[in-house]
C-alpha cells in the first residue's frame, strides 16, 4: 500500500504556488527585455532545487501546414547544453574499427538495428552512413516517432562520422517548428553564466534565421521567450539580437 503524505503534498504545492507568484511579480509582462537583462532575471527568480534547463520558445511567421515552410535543423551550442549525450553509430562492418575511435558510446552494425527492434533504445542520438540507410530504414517506425531516426538534414546521415560525433558530444540542439508555428528547445542550464547563456541564445536564434524558408512572407520572427523548467517566461526584445537587426534592415 502506498504511503502518501497528503500534508507534505499540500505544503509542497503551497510553496510552489508562492514561489511562482513571487517569480511572476518580478516580470513586467508588457515589456520586451534586453537579452542580458532577461538572463539575469531568470537566474534571479529560479527557485527549483535542481539545475533547471533554460528553455527558449520562438513564434515564427510561417505556415507549417505547407511543406515548403517547415523549419527544421540543428544549432551548435558554443557553451554546450549541460547534458551528457549518448551516441550510437551504425555503420558497415568494414568501418567498425575506424569509427570506434570517434568517441561514440557504441559503434555497431546490424547488431544495433536488431537491438532496436527488440526495444533496446538506449541512446540519445543515432548516426549512420549513407550506405547503411536501407538497413536502418527497417527501424524507422521505431526511431521516427521518438525523433531519433538518422536524417541527412540534421547531419546524422554522413560519411564524416567523427566530425558529427564531435559536434553532437560538444553540444547541439535539434529544432523543428510545431503545427502552431512555434519552436521550443532547451539551450543550456541555469547554472551557466549569463555570458554562456547569451552565447547559446545567439547561436540558436542565428540558426533559426538561417533556416528561414524562402516561401515565408512577412515578419519571420514574431516573438522570443526565455524561461526555466519551473519558472515563468520572459519576453525578449528581438531588436537586441544583432543578427536579427541586420536581417530587418
Swiss-Prot record:
GO MF assignments: rRNA binding; structural constituent of ribosome; tRNA binding
Signal peptide segment: none
Keyword Repressor on entry: yes
GO biological process: regulation of translation; translation
GO cellular component: large ribosomal subunit
Record keywords: Repressor, Ribonucleoprotein, Ribosomal protein, RNA-binding, rRNA-binding, Translation regulation, tRNA-binding
SUPFAM superfamilies xrefs: Ribosomal protein L1
Disulfide-bond pairs as recorded: none
Record keyword rRNA-binding present: yes
InterPro entries assigned to the protein according to its UniProt record, in alphabetical order: Ribosom_uL1_bac-type (IPR005878), Ribosomal_uL1 (IPR002143), Ribosomal_uL1-like (IPR023674), Ribosomal_uL1/biogenesis (IPR028364), Ribosomal_uL1_3-a/b-sand (IPR016095), Ribosomal_uL1_CS (IPR023673)
Family matches, as PROSITE patterns: RIBOSOMAL_L1
Subunit: Part of the 50S ribosomal subunit.
Record function comment: Binds directly to 23S rRNA. The L1 stalk is quite mobile in the ribosome, and is involved in E site tRNA release.
Entry's family note: Belongs to the universal ribosomal protein uL1 family.
NCBIfam families: rplA_bact
Name the record gives this protein: Large ribosomal subunit protein uL1
Organism: Orientia tsutsugamushi (strain Ikeda) (Rickettsia tsutsugamushi)
Gene: rplA
